[in-house]
């Protein structure tokens, strides 16, 4: 394929969304959100969603497409993102994936195989019950025994993906990492320009702390209250960082100060994991948004796009 694609990745709060808009305006681009939580309606503040009035006329895709009770997966993202890349190229514009969900983005440019297995609801129920009784770390230990490669890549708290991996093994007799590897054998699909934003850790952590404070000021607590009133307490989306802590506060289990502390701490940890993931990919060209302005970085990307006949 000769379809063009620009990707901008990096940890949370590093400036990806603002850079994506600046680049898109210069090159007649459209943005595809590479964030696993911004797909959900009504969850604006806690996901740091770019709101319509902030998009400066740049089309954004895969934002506000699902109700919070609906399931989203890397396989669905892969399918929709590839469809959008094709359509945007056909319109003579350039798709720009902007986000920090590493596996989602890799699934688009590295042809991961997400074979649509049908699963045994009884087996899934047993796994879910075991997780309730013994915690997700117990299932993660099970995964380590049958598929250490997947266990290393899937976080011990990511219950949905742990269960998925155990189901694949139960159903096929092969570890899910086998299907990941099988899907990566094909040649690259796109003409790719791949960029990452980073900055000094102390500065990034300061920005994360300030962002969380702003989320509280903007009304994160009221946003979570509305979601609870709409009946979404048990939805997977409400387990997202920034939401589950406020739910605990509203239920009287922790104080507001404790909730804010946990959100800041866990967001910093999340940013560290994001950087670790992306730094493993040698295709990414890195910019330091703590040392260079987004305008300067935009100019460099536009220059490189011109050299590579993207414009």
UniProtKB/Swiss-Prot annotation:
Residues binding substrate are 12-17
**Reaction catalyzed:** adenosine(37) in tRNA + dimethylallyl diphosphate = N(6)-dimethylallyladenosine(37) in tRNA + diphosphate
The enzyme's first-digit EC class, named in words, is transferase
What are the protein's UniProt keywords? ATP-binding, Magnesium, Nucleotide-binding, Transferase, tRNA processing
- Give the enzyme's EC designation: 2.5.1.75
The answer on whether this UniProt entry bears the keyword Nucleotide-binding reads yes
**UniProt KW Transcription keyword:** no
Positions of the region Interaction with substrate tRNA?
35-38
Q: Which domain of life is it from?
A: Bacteria
According to its UniProt entry, the protein's GO biological process terms are: tRNA modification
Q: Which cofactors does this gene product need?
A: Mg(2+)
Interaction with substrate tRNA, annotated site positions: 101, 124
Which residues does ATP bind? 10-17
* Any GO molecular function: tRNA dimethylallyltransferase activity
Which family is this protein grouped under? Belongs to the IPP transferase family.
For this protein, the record's PANTHER family field holds: TRNA DIMETHYLALLYLTRANSFERASE
Give the function comment from the record.
Answer: Catalyzes the transfer of a dimethylallyl group onto the adenine at position 37 in tRNAs that read codons beginning with uridine, leading to the formation of N6-(dimethylallyl)adenosine (i(6)A).
Quaternary organization: Monomer.
Q: What is this protein called?
A: tRNA dimethylallyltransferase
């Amino acid at each position: 394929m000769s379809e063009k694609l620009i990707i901008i990745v990096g940890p949370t709060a590093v400036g990806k969304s603002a850079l994506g808009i600046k680049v898109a305006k210069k090159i007649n681009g459209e943005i595809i959100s590479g964030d696993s939580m911004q797909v959900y309606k009504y969850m604006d503040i806690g996901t740091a969603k770019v709101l319509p009035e902030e998009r400066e006329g740049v089309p954004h895709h895969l934002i506000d497409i699902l109700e919070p009770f609906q399931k989203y997966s890397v396989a669905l993202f892969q399918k929709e993102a590839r469809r959008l890349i094709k359509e945007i190229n056909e319109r003579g514009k350039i798709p720009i994936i902007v986000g920090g969900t590493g596996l989602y983005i890799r699934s688009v440019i590295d042809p991961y195989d997400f074979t649509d297995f049908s699963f045994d609801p009884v087996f899934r129920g047993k796994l879910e019950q075991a997780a309730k009784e013994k915690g997700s770390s117990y299932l993660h230990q099970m995964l380590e025994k049958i598929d250490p490669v997947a266990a290393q890549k899937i976080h011990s708290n990511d219950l949905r993906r742990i269960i998925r991996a155990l189901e694949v093994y139960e159903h096929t007799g092969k570890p899910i990492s086998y299907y990941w590897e099988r899907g990566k054998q094909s040649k690259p699909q796109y003409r790719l320009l791949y960029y990452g934003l980073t900055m000094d850790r102390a500065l990034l952590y300061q920005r994360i702390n300030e962002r969380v404070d702003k989320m509280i000021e903007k009304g994160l607590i009221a946003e979570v209250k509305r979601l609870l009133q709409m009946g979404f307490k048990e939805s997977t989306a409400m387990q997202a960082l920034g939401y589950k802590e406020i739910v605990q506060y509203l239920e009287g289990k922790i104080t507001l100060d404790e909730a804010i502390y946990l959100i800041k701490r866990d967001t910093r940890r999340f940013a560290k994991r994001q950087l670790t993931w992306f730094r493993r990919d040698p295709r990414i060209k890195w910019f330091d948004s703590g040392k260079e302005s987004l305008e300067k970085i935009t100019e460099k990307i536009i220059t490189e796009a011109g050299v590579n006949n993207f414009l």
